[in-house]
């Protein structure tokens, strides 16, 4: 079992079998992704041109290749085959704000496990896999390739950045990367017809992110995995609570009214975040890090 604050490569490898029980990612295909005459019910981007052959009685005249027919002076039609694999691109947040937890595991560890489970799901499906793992100062990008070629290196990236955020705590990086930065850097690697999973707490979701997510949505399906700790639901009604963020520390007393204020504030923020993403056409999955991750993913991704 992996540590509560960092993952091991072995623990991510052991998730392969569990990934089989995750429901396939969304299969809707945007109209711009179609390459053929019909929408495929399987994963993929429609129909790809395969070859030409002579026209035979009963063939669909819509498949006529008029250039070849004119050149050869006999009727020829275009044959297509169905592309059944689909690019899967995973963006994994391993920045300092993800290094938080009150019990079980940090958000950074949960994000690492979610990414590994989804990567293994793509491996079982034979989908091309790509990804981006980012910390506060740098990042690793991998273009979509056959899963056997990408998966080992992607898991290494996850482990490296997961350990880096744990090792760096509590030091803060100047001018850390933003979620908008990573969406921008990843955009050129994401092709039409892709399924994109963004695994983050989305604490810095802003107008730049909105524009970039809208651009990504025009290329394919997006699922957001919002990792969160459920501390706000477990606060006592009395006592002292200490908090630290970005170098600032504070201690305040809890009361029933103060507790209700905190619960309302956090709940409202999460609801606004979900509404904002949903308006962009992003499927939102709120993942509580203190609960069983696999069961939450089995509800649908």
Predicted regions, residues:
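Exposed, interaction-prone extracellular/peripheral surfaces
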Residues: 1-41, 54-59, 68, 77-113, ...
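A positional/architectural concept
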Residues: 43-46
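N-terminal juxtadomain amphipathic helix
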Residues: 61-63
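Active-site SXXK
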Residues: 118
């Amino acid at each position: 079992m992996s540590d509560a604050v960092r993952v091991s490569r072995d623990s991510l490898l052991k998730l392969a079998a569990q990934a089989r029980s995750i429901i396939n990612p969304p299969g809707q295909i945007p109209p711009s992704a179609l390459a053929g005459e019909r929408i495929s019910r399987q994963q993929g981007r429609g129909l790809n041109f395969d070859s030409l052959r002579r026209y035979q009685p009963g063939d669909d005249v819509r498949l006529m290749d008029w250039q070849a027919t004119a050149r050869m002076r006999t009727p020829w039609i275009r044959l297509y085959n169905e592309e059944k694999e689909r690019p899967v691109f995973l963006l994994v947040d391993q920045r300092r704000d993800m290094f938080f937890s009150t019990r079980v595991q940090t958000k950074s560890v949960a994000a690492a496990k979610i990414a590994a489970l989804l990567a293994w799901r793509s491996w079982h499906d034979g989908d091309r896999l790509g990804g981006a793992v980012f910390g506060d100062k740098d990042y690793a990008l991998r273009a979509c390739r056959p899963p056997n070629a990408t998966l080992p290196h992607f898991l290494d990236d996850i482990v490296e950045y997961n350990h880096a955020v744990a090792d760096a705590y509590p030091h803060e990086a100047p001018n850390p990367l933003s979620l908008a930065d990573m969406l921008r850097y990843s955009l050129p690697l994401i092709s039409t017809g892709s399924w994109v999973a963004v695994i983050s707490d989305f604490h810095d979701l802003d107008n730049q992110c909105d524009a970039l997510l809208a651009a990504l949505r025009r290329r394919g399906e997006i699922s957001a995995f919002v990792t969160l700790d459920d501390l706000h639901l477990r606060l006592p009604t009395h006592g002292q609570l200490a908090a630290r963020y970005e170098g600032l520390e504070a201690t305040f007393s809890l009361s029933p009214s103060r507790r209700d204020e905190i619960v309302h504030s956090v709940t409202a923020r999460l609801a606004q975040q979900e509404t904002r993403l949903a308006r962009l056409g992003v499927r939102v999955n709120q993942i509580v890090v203190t609960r069983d991750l696999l069961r939450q993913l089995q509800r649908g991704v």
